[in-house]
Amino acid sequence: MSKVLYIKANIKNEGESRTFKVSDSFVEEYKKNNPEDQIITLDLYKENIDFLRADDLGKLFGPKDEESKNNSILKYAYQFADADKYIIAAPMWNLSFPAILKAYIDYVSVSGITFKYTAEGPVGLLNNKKAVHIVSRGGGYDNSPYEMGDRYLRTILGFFGIKDIETIDIDNLDVIGVNVKEKVKEGIEKAISLAKKF
C-alpha cells in the first residue's frame, strides 16, 4: 500500500479552479486503480502555513527526534518524507505558482528529514518516490524561459531525491478565442490516462 500526498495550492473555490478540475479527476481515477492506497489531501490555504520567521529557524535546525514530529513546522516535513507519491496541484501565478506553495516547500526542505549534508555536498533522502505536477496557465509556456514554476518544482524535488516526475499542463486558458472547456477536458483526459499508471 502506498501513501499519496495530494498537495493543493489555489485560493479559488473547488468548482472554480481549472487546476483542481484536472487534479481531482486524476485523484479519482487513481483511487479506482489503487483502492488500497491511502490518499492524504493537504489544502495549503486551509493549513496554518506562513512565511518562516526568525524563531522558526530554531525549529528547522533543532533536533530531529520523536518530540520534533509534533512540531508545528517540522510535522509537514515528516509528513512529506513519509509519503511515497506526490500530487501537486497549483496554477501558474506570475510565472511561478502561489506563494503559499513556496512557503510550504520552505517547511519541508529540512536537513535530516528530506535531505542531508555530506562532505560531497547535499544528498536527497526521498529516493524511489514519484510525483506529478498539475498546472493550469493562462498563456502558452512550453519550453519558455518565463516558465519558472514547474522548473523549480522539478529542481527542488530532485534535490530531495525524487527523480520520477511528470507534469500535466493545461496552457492558453486565457487566450482570446480558446475553447476553455475543451482545453480542460483535454487536461482531464491526460490526467486519467496518467493516473492509471502512476
UniProtKB/Swiss-Prot annotation:
Q: Which Enzyme Commission numbers does its entry carry? A: 1.6.5.-, 1.7.1.17
Which keywords accompany this UniProt record?
Answer: Flavoprotein, FMN, NAD, Oxidoreductase
Q: Name one Pfam family in it.
A: Flavodoxin_2
- Write down the chemical reaction(s) this protein catalyses: 2 a quinone + NADH + H(+) = 2 a 1,4-benzosemiquinone + NAD(+); N,N-dimethyl-1,4-phenylenediamine + anthranilate + 2 NAD(+) = 2-(4-dimethylaminophenyl)diazenylbenzoate + 2 NADH + 2 H(+)
Q: Name one GO molecular function term.
A: electron transfer activity
Entry cofactor note text?
Binds 1 FMN per subunit.
The protein's required cofactors = FMN
Provide the binding site for FMN: 92-95, 136-139
Q: Which InterPro entries match?
A: Flavodoxin_fold, Flavoprotein-like_sf, FMN-dep_NADH:Q_OxRdtase_AzoR1, NADH:quinone_OxRdtase_FMN_depd
Domain of life (superkingdom): Bacteria
Q: Which SUPFAM superfamilies match?
A: Flavoproteins
Similarity field: Belongs to the azoreductase type 1 family.
Function of the protein: Quinone reductase that provides resistance to thiol-specific stress caused by electrophilic quinones.
**Record text on subunit structure and interactions:** Homodimer.
For this protein, the record's PANTHER family field holds: FMN-DEPENDENT NADH-AZOREDUCTASE 1 (PTHR43741), FMN-DEPENDENT NADH:QUINONE OXIDOREDUCTASE (PTHR43741:SF7)
Q: What is this protein called?
A: FMN-dependent NADH:quinone oxidoreductase
Q: Which species does this protein come from?
A: Clostridium perfringens (strain SM101 / Type A)
